[in-house]
């Protein structure tokens, strides 16, 4: 399944992509009319949080089938053209990010590969697919992109052993880790440079792990104005998905809806000669095989 959160007619909702259509089943409405018992999560985060007692996907499947068979299926579908995509997990939980997890990317920025580099991104930085974000020209002329695979956590745990780590994964999404390279180079921490308003585009969907079991050999391509800038593969990650979860959970308790950004391949603007930073009016597309394409526009 492909889950998403969205705004329609000024109301926030969530849903699951309609198969073979650019449309979403509005699960707020579907559950209101076809839920079994009192199962009626109001947000995707609430659904994930209840997944430990009920099979969330099975509840979704049953409710959608009932809507399809009702004779009024179209009443529960909304075209992608009519919605505003929100970050898939809404309201947002923690976003924990790994830097320097691709050797070639670390090398292009002259960073040490051996040292673990972890940071968080502010919840206020999150935005969805097709968003226009500020150009931040008032504070920087070094706005950069980083296309990344995101892991969506599906159940709570800490000190999770590598052998069990994948049991805690609910699915995967796409992240563009927008970065102010000027602030990053001037400061001893990454939080501010990584938490600009609009600095964490995410989506368009969460693809559940039954559809994408282990994306450790999928292509990540980032284009700026249709020019390929990053052309990498998750097989290049230094720490794999199970190792990332094991490492983070040694220190931080993970909960449903938490997102782990797994690092970016080579090809960022700061690594080019001369550097090629984002400019007002730019279009940035991050595509990951079997998930989709995340599009972001830089305000003029």
UniProtKB/Swiss-Prot annotation:
Ion transport found in the keyword field: no
Protein's UniProt name: Uncharacterized protein SAOUHSC_00906
Record: residues binding a divalent metal cation: 146, 148, 177
Family membership noted in the UniProt record: Belongs to the FAH family.
Alphabetic keyword roster: Metal-binding
Pfam families, A to Z: FAA_hydrolase
GO molecular function: acetylpyruvate hydrolase activity; metal ion binding
Signal peptide: none
Top-rank taxon: Bacteria
Keyword Metal-binding assigned: yes
């Amino acid at each position: 399944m492909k889950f998403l959160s969205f705004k329609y007619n000024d109301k926030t909702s969530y849903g699951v992509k309609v198969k073979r259509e650019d449309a979403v089943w509005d699960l707020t409405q579907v559950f209101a009319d076809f839920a079994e018992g009192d199962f009626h999560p109001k947000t995707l985060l609430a659904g994930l949080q209840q997944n430990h007692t009920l099979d969330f996907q099975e509840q979704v499947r049953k409710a959608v089938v009932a809507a399809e068979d009702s004779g009024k299926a179209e009443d529960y579908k909304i075209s992608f053209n009519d919605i505003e995509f929100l970050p898939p997990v809404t309201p947002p939980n923690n976003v924990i990010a790994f830097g320097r997890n691709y050797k070639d990317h670390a090398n292009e920025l002259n960073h040490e590969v051996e040292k673990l580099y972890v940071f968080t991104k502010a919840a206020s930085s999150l935005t969805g697919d097709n968003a226009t974000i500020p150009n931040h020209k008032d504070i920087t002329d070094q706005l950069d992109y980083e296309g990344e695979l995101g892991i969506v956590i599906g159940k709570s745990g800490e000190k999770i052993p590598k052998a069990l780590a994948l049991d805690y994964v609910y699915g995967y999404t796409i992240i563009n880790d927008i970065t102010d390279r000027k602030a990053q180079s001037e400061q001893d921490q990454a939080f501010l440079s990584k938490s600009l308003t609009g600095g964490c585009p995410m989506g368009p969907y969460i693809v559940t792990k039954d559809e994408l079991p282990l994306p450790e050999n999928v292509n990540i391509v980032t284009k700026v104005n249709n020019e390929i800038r990053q052309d990498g593969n998750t097989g290049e990650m230094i720490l794999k998905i199970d190792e990332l979860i094991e490492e983070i959970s040694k220190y931080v308790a993970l909960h449903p809806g938490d997102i782990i950004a797994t690092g970016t391949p080579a090809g960022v603007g700061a690594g080019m000669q001369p550097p090629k930073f984002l400019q007002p009016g730019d279009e940035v597309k991050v595509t990951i095989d079997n998930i989709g394409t995340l599009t972001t526009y830089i305000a003029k």
